[in-house]
Amino acid sequence: MERIGRINRRKIYYVQIRNNTEWKFSLPKNDWVAFTIANKEDEQLVPPAAKICMDKNVSYTCSAGTLAHWTEQYFDEEITGRAFDYEMQTKQEFDYESSPITTAHQNFNEGFWFATTLAHDAHKEIDKVVCLDFTKRKVKKHLTELIDKINNGWLPSDEEIELAEYDN
């Protein structure tokens, strides 16, 4: 995992998931935002990554790429499954207030801006955003450009759909 910048008090990290078996060991242990970037060809990588993020106590997930809504839905299903398991084991009602919040963004730039500036948890301070890049073509360069723009007052467009710019 590589630190690629900072926005206000949040440190921004980037990790390429594809062909990188070590990525999961570098994730924070708690209180962090996952900004996921996944496209159709990355679908098989999402389920195990969602489980790992949940195991690492992710506080918020913001999903982008052509699989944004599917990725968000998968995180929601993982949360629900864990809640069900908790209720079956403890015979107590699960407190969804302690669950991660999930969002999907068809506008890539807006999603990154949201993850780095607005995503929050009322109960804990979030000071890390980890960009989990599932793609073959990589978006690291685009993310570093967005960090500079956001730090200089840039706001995302109102376009409903805006795709990522890829490194290659």
What are these regions (language model features)?
Residues E2-N168:
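ATP-dependent carboxylate-amine ligase
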